[in-house]
Amino acid sequence: MDLPGPIHDILLVFLGSGLILGGLGVVLFTTPIYSAFSLGLVFVCISLFYIPSNSYFVAAAQLLIYVGAVNVLIVFAVMFMNGSEYYKDFHLWTVGDGITSLVCTSILFSLITTILETSWYGIIWTTRSNQIIEQDLTSNVQQMGIHLSTDFYLPFELTSIILLVALIGAIAMARQ
C-alpha cells in the first residue's frame, strides 16, 4: 500500500498502540474472557501490520486463522472453565512472579537495545535462486508459493510458530 509518509506513520503508531494495549490486557486482566478478547485485539493488530507492506495474503490468512479460529477456540475453552477455581488462594505477587518479571523485563530491555543499536539497512533477509527469477511464472499460485518461500519466509514461519503456541495453549486451557 503506497501511503504518504505521515499517514503511514500514524497507522503504525495506531497499530503499535493497539498491540501494546492488547498485550497488556492479556497479561493484566484477571478475568480469562477479557484476556481472550485482548488476545483477539493483538491478533488483529498483528495481521493489520502486514497491509502497509503489501502482504495482503499474509494479513488475510492471519486474520482468518488467528482471529477466526484460534481466538474463537480460546474463547470457547475459557467459557467452559469454572471461573471460581481461579480465585482460590489468589496471591497478588509471589517470589516466582517476581523472578519471572525480572527475567522478562531484562529480556525486553536487551531486545529494545539490540533493535535500536542495529543498523537494519542493507540486510538481505532471503536469497533467491537465479532459476526462480528467470522463470516466467504464469499462475498466481506459483507466484504466491515463490513469495511465501522467499520474500515472506520469515513472517510465514513466525506465523506458524505463533499458531502452534496458541493451539497448545488453547488445548492446555481446555484440559484443565
From Swiss-Prot:
GO terms for cellular component: chloroplast thylakoid membrane. Pfam families: Oxidored_q3. Its EC number is 7.1.1.-. Its main location: plastid. Keywords: Chloroplast, Membrane, NAD, NADP, Plastid, Plastoquinone, Quinone, Thylakoid, Translocase, Transmembrane, Transmembrane helix, Transport. Gene3D superfamilies: NADH-ubiquinone/plastoquinone oxidoreductase chain 6, subunit NuoJ (1.20.120.1200). GO terms for molecular function: NADH dehydrogenase (ubiquinone) activity; quinone binding. It is found in: Plastid, Chloroplast thylakoid membrane. The chain crosses the membrane at residues 10-30, 32-52, 61-81, 90-112, 152-172. It is a multi-pass membrane protein. NDH shuttles electrons from NAD(P)H:plastoquinone, via FMN and iron-sulfur (Fe-S) centers, to quinones in the photosynthetic chain and possibly in a chloroplast respiratory chain. The immediate electron acceptor for the enzyme in this species is believed to be plastoquinone. Couples the redox reaction to proton translocation, and thus conserves the redox energy in a proton gradient. NDH is composed of at least 16 different subunits, 5 of which are encoded in the nucleus. PANTHER family: NAD(P)H-QUINONE OXIDOREDUCTASE SUBUNIT 6, CHLOROPLASTIC. This is NAD(P)H-quinone oxidoreductase subunit 6, chloroplastic.
